Structure formats: C-alpha cells, structure tokens
C-alpha cells in the first residue's frame, strides 16, 4: 500500500514492484537489515524468497473461502493465503512440529491476520471432516535441494534410503489432503526441492493413485521455468533457480473431481475450541481499540491471554480440533495490555489515543 511504501522510503529502503503479484516487492537497497525496519516490526511486510510466494498465488483462493495450510510454519504462505481470502474467509494453519508452532503464531500475530487460526496435528491424520475445505496448500517436508545457496549440504544429505521416509510422508500427506478437499476444490502441492521423485513423481501419484486432476498453471512473469521431468506433468512449474534469481521450487495445481458446489460448514454450536470466557467487544474501547473493526467472531480469554475467534472458524472446525485464534494481548482483572504490534483494531479516531510526536523530540 502507499502507506507501507512511504514508511519504507522514509527509512531509506529502495524497492521495486514484482511483475507476478501486486502484493510483492523486490528489495534493491537497504540502509540496515530489512527485518529491523518499522514496516517489518509492525507486520506490514513479510520477508521471504520470491519463489515461496508462488504457491499461494497459484492456489488463488476466492474471497471468503475456507483454506487449509497443512504444514504452515513459519507462516509466509499462511499469511498470503489469509490476505487472499480476506476477513470473511478462514485460513487454518496446521504445524505438526510443536517447536515450530510458536514461531507460526508469532508471525501471524505480527501480520495482524484475524482470519487466520492455528493448530498442531500430524498432517497425515488431521481430525477434520471429509470434503470440508475449499482449498488446501500442501508444502510438505522435503529434501530442500532447491535451497543449496543456504543449505549447501542438502543434496548430499538427502539421498537413497534416507530419502525414502520423506517420500512416504509426502504421499500420506497428499492422501490426507485429497480426503479433506471438497469436490471441485483445489490443491497446490509445492516443494523447495529439485528432486523429481518428490515433485513430478508425487504429482503422478496424486493423479494416478488418488484420482486428482491436474490443472495447468500459467508461468508467472519474472521467473524462468524448466520443463517438467516426467510425462503427464505438463503445466506444473519448476523454478529455474539460477535464471530466476530465486530458490529452486516446484508447484503443481490439482483439482478434486466432482460438483463444485460449496460444502456447508458445521452449524454453530457443533464446533468449539477449548472452554473459554467470552468478553464483550465493547471492552476493547476502554484501551484505545475499536470493536467496530472486528470481523464477526468472539473475544475470549484463555488463562491470561485475550484471543479473537473468527466466526468462520467457530462454524467450520469440529470440537475435536484444538485451535487458537490471534492473540490480542494480556488480560487480567485490571484490564487489557494490548500487544505492542496490534494495529488491526486501532481506533479510527486517532485524537482519542495518547501519542508522542517524534518530530518534536
């Protein structure tokens, strides 16, 4: 947005638009590491390799859609998906590895994405109903052969018998993704490896073994793509890392056959998260926050933390799923201490908020 670009320029950063998405910019010069910028601190930007932006753009979920990100941490793809579905939609970011879950939640909270919720389950056995998601992004654990600039030992490390459990896990995850996808729904399978067994080989498994239909992808401008390495995988994208000045990446778009009519969500009341104490939205106004900026949903206190629970999640997720909405701050009997990065609910009447003009300091 113009505000974010102005904030970056004010700190001396130079950047240019990327041709493949209006959401993306390429950094050209930085007076200090971009991660230390105000724009990064307040979650206006997310720093990532340009290739990793492509899977959510290839999935391209509709506004208001229900989207599952099966292996979500650190959250860059989850965040972009949440931007695409908007505040009326839902993105569930599942991170099977508990140590990585905190990082996912921290990043999504910094981005102020109220429509994104998180959980932690084995990706191959999620406690979710069949055919319940409009779109699924599966970016599974992989050998990382496309990241040799950062991980030079990746190709040497992941060979032969050591790779077999990874291939088996990827197929289990694809099978689960197919189960969860509604008829007519779309699946993006992506990896940051150049290994054909993990890429084209798995796409052929999805088509021949699971009955999914390939959807040819149009090449994204600004990238160079190598030809797929197996027949039947035409229309999948293999990023040429050297020619594209980006990580090696593979992206395939698949569709589940059947009627494309949306599968209705669960009736409210049949879905729930852990027991919580509901808080009236007007509570926020006492702390310079605007309840009117909340999308439909509930405010809830879990122990000493105030979270937002979006209505689509309350309606869509069954009771068996333990999930968490975005943390807004710390709550106690004395009131609320909003998160220092919370901007999604800032009062639109700024004169009501105490402030310090740094130009006068």
Placement of each model-derived feature along the sequence:
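Conserved class I S-adenosyl-L-methionine
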Residues: 64-73, 92
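A short N-terminal interaction module
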Residues: 1-32
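Mobile active-site "lid"/loop adjacent to the S-adenosyl-L-methionine
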Residues: 99, 135-176, 192-200, 215, ...
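Conserved SAM-binding loop of SAM-dependent methyltransferases across substrates and taxa
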Residues: 74-87
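Conserved beta-strand signature within the Rossmann-like core of class I S-adenosyl-L-methionine
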Residues: 186-191
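Polybasic, low-complexity RNA-engagement segments
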Residues: 1-11, 247, 257-361
């Amino acid at each position: 947005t113009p505000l974010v670009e102005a904030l970056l320029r004010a700190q001396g950063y130079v950047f240019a638009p990327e041709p493949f998405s209006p959401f993306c910019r390429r950094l050209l010069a930085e007076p200090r590491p971009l991660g230390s910028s105000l724009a990064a601190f307040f979650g206006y930007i997310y720093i990532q390799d340009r290739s990793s932006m492509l899977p959510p753009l290839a999935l391209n979920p509709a506004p208001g859609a229900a989207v599952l990100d099966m292996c979500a941490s650190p959250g860059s793809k989850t965040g972009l998906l949440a931007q695409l579905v908007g505040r009326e939609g839902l993105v569930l970011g599942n991170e099977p590895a508990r140590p990585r879950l905190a990082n996912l939640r921290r990043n999504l909270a910094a981005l102020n994405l109220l429509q994104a919720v998180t959980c932690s389950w084995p990706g191959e056995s999620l406690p979710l109903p069949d055919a319940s998601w409009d779109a699924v992004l599966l970016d599974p654990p992989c050998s990382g052969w496309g990241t040799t600039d950062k991980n030079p030992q990746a190709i040497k490390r992941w060979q032969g018998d050591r790779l077999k459990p990874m291939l088996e896990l990827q197929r289990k995850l694809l099978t689960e993704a197919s189960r969860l996808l509604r008829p007519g729904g779309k699946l993006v399978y992506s990896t940051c490896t150049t290994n054909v067994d993990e890429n084209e080989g798995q796409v052929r498994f999805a088509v021949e073994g699971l009955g999914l239909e390939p959807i040819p992808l149009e090449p994204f401008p600004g990238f160079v793509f190598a030809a797929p390495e197996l027949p039947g995988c035409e229309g999948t994208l293999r990023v040429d890392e050297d020619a594209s000045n980006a990580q090696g990446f593979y992206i395939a778009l698949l569709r589940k056959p059947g009627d494309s009519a949306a599968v209705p969500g669960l009736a409210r009341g049949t879905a729930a998260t852990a027991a919580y104490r509901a808080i009236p939205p007007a509570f926020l106004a006492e702390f310079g926050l605007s309840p009117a900026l909340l999308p439909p949903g509930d405010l809830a206190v879990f122990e000493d933390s105030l979270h937002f629970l979006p209505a689509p999640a309350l309606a869509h997720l069954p009771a068996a799923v333990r999930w968490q909405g975005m943390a807004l701050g710390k709550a106690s009997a004395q009131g609320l201490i909003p998160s220092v990065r919370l901007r999604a609910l800032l009062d639109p009447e700024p004169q009501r908020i105490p402030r310090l003009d740094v130009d006068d300091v």
